[in-house]
Design a protein with these regions (language model features):
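Membrane-embedded alpha-helical bundles of multi-pass transporters/translocases
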Residues: 1-520
Length: 520
């Protein structure tokens, strides 16, 4: 694999690491401020919809549809044609999103009723959750305009990525985290309902992200004046690819929205427990899988345009191997150390030992699907780079159906934990079907060394998990320690686990050069 691709991956991972660390700090601040009660449930609900749209546009459908077309124009056209494409895309997309944003703000009550049906039912009948419905409707009015800002932020980031400027778009989410932290520290004390300050932070964070990237577009002479271009050939191609991709890429996020709706029928705290467990999974998912996906999509699109199927398959194989290298130990490590991680990160203020235990249960269920969700981020570009958006949609529909069935099977005996387990099961099915499709089409064939490589990773990960499980005390002991001592103990154990993993890999014969090629 080329040094340029590896270097790009390292840059994106580094910038993403900064963003994810700030995201964890933000969640620590939120846990301290709101805990896992009524206010937390309502804020996480109100933030779920714009957050879903962020995934959809910043890491999903728009990027998957736009980058291959942009790459094609860059290769086959001159700069004027590229700028004309960008103007048409910006104007058309901007017009549509402006209308959607206005409808979302004006219809926040309808959206709240749709995705928070349990709260809406109580509101209609004067039940105990009526206050949640009213507060969620108000907060959604504040957070929904984030969609408008993040749409153009995503477009700017996709343009920069096609020019090899990966660091800017990867670092941009840091500003959302900073503004939300600032809102919690400085605006919340001034308000009767501190959760509203966080909604204001989401709005301001979208604005700051929107403004940050545009000077970099000017540097590459790609800052254009938007104009309506519904019938522009490039726009036609992008929307043809994007409409099915809106569904195909966002299956896991749609499943989370469904889980949120069902959790509104459960006891207070269910939405918060699911949120905190999901946030911990987002760290390895964003740091590793999204970073790898970000750099391989333009590379795959170029290899498809160049008609180089062998190198296309090798690039995909490299992406899968990197996800396995980082995803297997992350999955096992989080599963084993979930309680101490939650304790150290969130147990302060309104978030106590009970909340740690409850969040830990859903985190364990969610972790079973972490590797599959990471693989989806690498396998899906194998379709979108070839401008095939229909196959992921068909697979996504099957995955969503599986999620619904699992929800019905698991929610009664397991409650909110069953919802987390359903998402994990549907994600695993999604990844398996994506791989099967690529293999049957002879688009991606793993190298003969990849199977052995992955088996060695599994052995090293299991041994690492065994060491951590043996050395880690129970939750009561973690809770009895001071924050300082618990943090030191956790850092030492995680460092030891990483060392065990690395040493076992070396003993099994894996060397750094194997990360650049198909060797084992």
């Amino acid at each position: 694999m080329s040094k340029k691709l590896i270097k790009s991956g390292m840059i994106v991972s580094g910038m993403t690491l900064a963003s994810r660390v700030m995201g964890l700090v933000r969640d620590v601040v939120i846990a301290n401020l709101l805990g896992a009660g009524v206010a937390a449930d309502v804020f996480f609900f109100a933030n779920r919809i714009p957050n879903f749209l962020r995934r959809l546009f910043a890491e999903g459908a728009f990027n998957q549809a736009f980058v291959p077309v942009m790459t094609e124009y860059k290769k086959n056209g001159d700069e004027g044609e590229v700028r004309e494409l960008l103007a048409a895309v910006a104007g058309t997309l901007g017009g549509i999103v402006t209308v959607v944003t206005l409808l979302g703000v004006l219809g926040s009550g309808v959206l709240t009723a749709l995705f928070g049906w349990g709260w809406f039912w109580d509101w209609l009948h004067g039940g105990p959750a009526a206050e949640k419905f009213e507060l969620a409707s108000l907060m959604l009015k504040i957070t929904f305009p984030y969609l408008w800002f993040i749409t153009f932020t995503a477009m700017a980031g996709a343009i920069l990525n096609t020019f090899g400027r990966f660091a800017v778009s990867s670092f941009t989410p840091v500003f959302l985290n900073i503004t939300m932290i600032a809102a919690a520290w400085w605006i919340a004390p001034l308000m009767d309902k501190p959760e509203i300050s966080l909604a204001i932070g989401v709005f301001l964070g979208g604005l700051v992200q929107f403004l940050f990237q545009y000077p970099f577009l000017r540097q590459i002479n790609m800052l254009v004046w938007p104009k309506w271009g519904w019938h522009h050939p490039g726009v036609v191609k992008i929307r043809t690819l994007m409409i099915p991709a809106l569904f195909g890429v966002s299956v896991s996020q749609i499943n989370l929205l469904v889980n949120t709706m069902l959790a509104s029928f459960l006891a207070t705290g269910a939405i918060s427990y699911l949120y905190y467990s999901d946030r911990l999974l987002e760290f390895p998912l964003g740091l590793f899988a999204v970073a790898i996906s970000t750099v391989i999509l333009p590379a795959l699109a170029k290899k498809h345009v160049d008609a180089d199927p062998a190198d296309f398959s090798r690039t995909m194989d490299w992406g899968v191997r990197m996800v396995m290298l980082l995803g297997l130990p992350a999955m096992i490590g989080i599963a084993v150390m979930r309680e101490p991680i939650l304790r150290v990160l969130f147990m302060r203020g309104e978030f106590g030992l009970h909340e740690v235990a409850m969040s830990s249960a859903s985190l364990l269920a969610s972790t079973t699907g972490l590797l599959s969700l990471m693989l989806i981020k690498v396998l899906a570009p194998g379709y979108y780079a070839r401008q095939d958006t229909k196959t992921p949609v068909r697979i996504g529909m099957m995955s969503m159906a599986a999620n619904m069935v699992c929800n019905l099977l698991f929610i009664y005996p397991l409650g909110y934990v069953g919802l987390a387990l359903s998402t994990a099961c549907s994600g695993t099915l999604n990844a398996a079907l994506l791989f099967k499709g690529l293999y049957q089409q002879s688009v991606y064939r793993p190298s003969r060394h990849t199977g052995v490589f992955c088996l060695k990773l599994l052995v090293a990960s299991v041994l690492m998990g065994g060491v951590l499980a043996y050395l880690s005390p129970d939750l009561a002991q973690w809770g009895a320690w001071s924050m300082g001592k618990a943090s030191v103990q956790l850092t030492m154990l995680l460092s030891l686990g990483a060392a065990v993993y690395a040493v076992v890999l070396l003993l099994l014969g894996i060397r750094p050069r194997h990360l650049k090629s198909g060797q084992q």
